[in-house]
Each structure stands twice: as structure tokens, then as C-alpha cells.
Amino acid sequence: MALSLESTSFPMLAVSRSTASELPGGFNVSHNSSWTGPTDPSSLQDLVATGVIGAVLSTMGVVGVVGNVYTLVVMCRFLRASASMYVYVVNLALADLLYLLSIPFIVATYVTKDWHFGDVGCRVLFSLDFLTMHASIFTLTIMSSERYAAVLRPLDTVQRSKGYRKLLALGTWLLALLLTLPMMLAIRLVRRGSKSLCLPAWGPRAHRTYLTLLFGTSIVGPGLVIGLLYIRLARAYWLSQQASFKQTRRLPNPRVLYLILGIVLLFWACFLPFWLWQLLAQYHQAMPLTPETARIINYLTACLTYGNSCINPFLYTLLTKNYREYLRGRQRSLGSSCRGPGSAGSFLSSRVHLQQDSGRSLSSNSQQATETLVLSPVPPNGAFV
């Protein structure tokens, strides 16, 4: 998904300046810079760069596909429970897997410097980039809001069933597809001499507007929402820490929140350079860069976006591991409190007084009970719920 400076498209293909100059009316299409395929002769430096990028992407593809398939198998095996985290992790792993499956087409285009997959390939592979990118960030936004609700408004999450969460996950894919449809319909295969290029049917202004819109829906909008949620969570945890210290209560473990935030930050770190590169090509076309430099930047941004999907499975494993430990601790604590005298009264009282007027300090008993109601019991052998 890394376009060249001159071509303003996305998935990854490395288009050179000469390719851009061939487009009608000087249209600076950054369409999958590499998807379109460069036309200038290959130098030794270009051959070495192509070989290195092909090897790196192939390695990323193998590692990422194995990791995400493993995640999907494990998550689907234990998806019988209504644990929200597992429903969303399945969606993230599926998006990563679909994105990684485009690597063979990218590598083939890099090596041959031509597009061999026809008009349907243009539409599917170009659209797949935007589809999976939006599905991932939308799912991460929902996960952040779920954790926010579980910490600050746990009673609101009790009524949310597994079916509700699956519907929400389906909605993220439908919204991502809706945002991707314009590219799917506009992209087409064009012959330029002996080369095949994937180009949009619309003009440069429409293309720039569309890419700017997608930057807003994939980076800016979700970033503002997630940032606001974590700022409020940080404030709530700080207030809760003060209250917990005074009342000698133990704070809920925030490791799950940290891991979700880590996945979000990794997404931004990998995709923000790609988007800045694309928008720079759209709004500042006269860049003092040689074709070789543009290709190298295109290669690096491509590796970053695929690297995100390659690293994510390891973070998903840590996330689910910490989530299971978190639930076990909550259930053990709840079980011991329920066995004590008057536990029912104290539980109901804690639910009523979950959010205190002094700044929403967290009630550990209420949160424990809510997590147990929302999630099925964790078996003693450590299986996923």
C-alpha cells in the first residue's frame, strides 16, 4: 500500500516519474504506485532494491499470514463465549490476513514492472487496501469505546450480547466497504505502450478530494475519538487512584487498555507515513526528488504498512493473554466476596454507587460483577472464554 510520489494511489507499486508523465493531462495518479508499474529501464541499483523489497515483503507475508491464521483459529475455537475482546480480535486478524494476501501480487508487479492481473485485479486489490485499513481502525475505535464503557459505565455493557457485538463488527466492514466503493468503481486497467496501468477514471481534483476524505476517515476521525476516550480514561484512573489510596482499595489492572492503545499507536506509526506521502504528492507535486529517491520512499512506506499486519498477531496474543488473566483475577475476587456474609447487599450497593460524584472514582466490586456478567466463566485450565 505504498504509492510513489508521482502516482497518487495506494496499494503498493512503485511508479516512477516517467510513468506519471505518461498519464493523460499530466494526471499525477498515485494509484498504488507500484500497482501501476514503472516503465523506465532498470538500473543495477533498481534491481537490488527490487530484490530486497521483494524478499522483505515475502518474509513479512509468510510470518504475518501464519500469525494471523493462528490467531483466527484460536479465537474462533473459543468464540462461543460472549467476550467482546475475542469478537473484535477476530475482525482485526481477518483484516490483517486479507491485506497480507495481496503481497504476492505486489511482489510480482515489483519484479516484472508490469501489471498482470487484469481489470478485476485492479479493482479488487486496490479496494482491498482501503477496505482492510478502515475495518482495522474502526474495530480499534470500537474496542477502545468498549473498554471505556467497561471501566466508567460498566452497567451499560451488561445488556450487550455477543450477537450485538457481532452486528457491530459487521457494521464496521459495511462502512469500510462503503468508503471503498468509489475506488472500486473508478479504477480501471489502461494500456500505455507495452505496460498495463491501474488508473482512476476521475480527474486529479476528484482523486485528491477522495484521498483527503479517506485520510480523515482512517486517521484523523478515529484518532480524535480514541484520543478523547483515552484522555477521559486516564483522568478516571487518576481520580480512582486517589480514591483507592484513601480507601485502601485496589485499582483495576489497566494492562488491557495499554495493549489496545499499543495496537492503535502501532497502526498510526505504520500508516501515517504512508498517508503523508500520498497527500504530499497530491498537494505538492513539484517535489525536488529523483525517481530513485521516490521509489525508495515508496518501498519504505509499503514495508511499514505490511509490517503492521505482520506484528499485530504478537500483540493480539499478549492482549488475549492479559485479558484472560484480568478476568480470572476479577472472578476470584468476586467469588471470595460473594462467599462472605452480606455479600449480596454490598454487591447491589456497589452497583448503585458505581460512579461517585467526586469525579467518577471506580468501584472495583461493581466492575468485577459487570465483567463477570458480560463474559462467561474462565475455565480453570486457562482456555479462552
UniProtKB/Swiss-Prot annotation:
GO terms for biological process: blood vessel diameter maintenance; regulation of blood pressure. Residues 1-53, 113-123, 186-208, 284-298 are extracellular. Pfam families: 7tm_1. It comes from the Eukaryota. SUPFAM superfamilies: Family A G protein-coupled receptor-like. Keywords: Cell membrane, Disulfide bond, G-protein coupled receptor, Glycoprotein, Membrane, Receptor, Transducer, Transmembrane, Transmembrane helix. Residues 77-86, 146-166, 232-257, 321-385 are cytoplasmic. GO terms for molecular function: urotensin II receptor activity. Glycans are attached at residues 28, 32. Disulfide bonds join 122-198. The chain crosses the membrane at residues 54-76, 87-112, 124-145, 167-185, 209-231, 258-283, 299-320. It is found in: Cell membrane. PROSITE patterns: G_PROTEIN_RECEP_F1_1 (PS00237), G_PROTEIN_RECEP_F1_2 (PS50262). It is a multi-pass membrane protein. GO terms for cellular component: plasma membrane. InterPro entries: GPCR_Rhodpsn, GPCR_Rhodpsn_7TM, Urot_II_rcpt. High affinity receptor for urotensin-2 and urotensin-2B. The activity of this receptor is mediated by a G-protein that activate a phosphatidylinositol-calcium second messenger system. Belongs to the G-protein coupled receptor 1 family. This is Urotensin-2 receptor.
